[in-house]
A protein has these predicted regions:
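N-terminal small/glycine-rich loop or linker at the start of catalytic domains
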Residues: 4-16, 48-71, 103, 108-111, ...
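Active-site beta-loop-alpha junctions enriched in small/polar residues
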Residues: 20, 45-47, 75-77, 102-104, ...
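Alpha/beta enzyme core
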Residues: 34, 83-113, 121-198
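Hydrophobic faces of well-ordered beta-strands that scaffold small-molecule active sites
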Residues: 15-19, 40-42, 70-74, 97, ...
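Glycine-rich, positively charged N-terminal anion/phosphate-binding segment
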Residues: 2-5, 20-95
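Alpha/beta catalytic cores of nucleotide-metabolism and tRNA/nucleoside-modifying enzymes
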Residues: 1-3, 7, 11, 15-16, ...
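Aromatic- and acidic-residue-enriched carbohydrate-binding clefts of CAZyme catalytic domains
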Residues: 118
Length: 337
């Protein structure tokens, strides 16, 4: 995969970690960047600055130590509030502003934000023009193919975005009504790529190196946005990059490497959030890492009862030590994709 440009920034590849609330915090962004992502995007930050004093919001706006270019996603339904939020995030260190018009969650859509905005093309235009006009950094946009299957206006929204000065567009191959059910479709993304000259990223169900190549061929997209498939599997970026570059499938990481990556991730979560919050947030990540391994369900029940950082680390080490004994060491056992 060739390098991809977003404004003045040249990415090492077109593989992007999609913004996911409660997932793509700074420790996970740093990890995915080390393991091959060309760009990592922050968790969604509300455009309502009156809510920025919560600890959750403050943690989401820590950009010091983030891999560059620092991309921050904002969400909301008011053009002026989004413009103000974009400006404030740039002052805090954001180098790219990403606008969320793709989240299908009810708590977002019920506030006329996320993919709910696709219903109102005039408002879309107003928001994009306001944000692009408010900052001197590239502004990118994430959308879905439409509101529902009878209202697939992704192509129209893409043209509005290009006219407003959006630098790059990511398109999830489902409508808002689809949520995450069924299979993503890529025909709409292909039509959008044909119709606009800005950078286009395809998103949806990209869970393997082979699928990544098929989606690129089907859409003609410049790159790929990868979200849920990276949960517990941050090495998916290097797997895809290697396959696209060489045509060879990288073997799954051996257990010793999975243990090392997981322990590094645990340590980063504990350091970033502190003992109490770090322990709580680590639980879901550990569950994702171990989901495909025998005994994971029982281990997760045990792990989720732990409330100290040292206990979490020790228990993870014990889990992998037990695996080594049951499987033998050096047998090339890896974690399935």
């Amino acid at each position: 995969m060739s390098a991809v440009r977003i404004g003045p920034y040249t990415l090492q590849n077109g593989l992007i970690l999609a913004p996911m609330a409660g997932v793509t915090d700074q420790p996970f962004r740093q990890l995915c960047k080390r393991l091959g992502a060309g760009l990592v995007v922050s968790e969604m930050v509300t455009s309502d600055m009156s809510l920025w004093n919560t600890r959750k919001s403050r943690m989401r706006m820590i950009h010091e130590g983030d891999p560059e270019p620092r991309s921050v996603q904002i969400a909301g339904g008011d053009a002026q509030m989004l413009a103000d939020a974009a400006r404030a995030n740039v002052e805090l260190g954001a180098q790219i502003i990403d606008i969320n018009m793709g989240c299908p969650a009810k708590k977002v859509c019920n506030k006329a934000a996320g993919s709910a905005l696709l219903k109102d093309e005039q408002l879309v235009a107003e928001i994009l023009q306001a944000v692009v006009g408010a900052v001197d950094v590239p502004v990118t946009l994430k959308i879905r193919t439409g509101w529902d299957r009878d209202n697939k206006n992704g192509l129209t929204v893409a043209k509005i975005a290009e006219q407003a000065g959006i630098t790059a567009l990511a398109v999830h191959g489902r409508t808002r009504a689809d949520l995450y059910t069924g299979e993503a479709e890529y025909d709409t993304i292909a039509a959008i790529k044909q119709a606009v000259s800005m950078t286009v990223f395809a998103n949806g169900d990209i869970d393997s190196a082979e699928k990544a190549r098929r989606v690129l061929h089907a859409t003609g997209a410049d790159g790929l946005l990868i979200g849920r498939a990276a949960q517990g599997r941050p090495w998916i970026f290097r797997e895809i990059e290697h396959f696209l570059r060489t045509g060879e499938v990288l073997p799954a990481p051996e257990l010793v490497e999975v243990e090392r990556i997981l322990l590094e991730h645990l340590a980063a979560l504990h350091a970033f959030y502190g003992d109490v919050m770090g322990v709580r947030i680590a639980r879901k990540h550990v569950g994702w890492y171990l989901a495909t391994l025998p005994g994971a369900k029982e281990f997760r029940a045990q792990f989720n009862r732990l409330d100290e950082t040292q206990a979490q680390v020790a228990t993870v080490r014990e889990f992998f030590a037990g695996r080594d004994k049951s499987l033998g060491t050096g047998d090339g056992e890896g974690v399935a994709a």
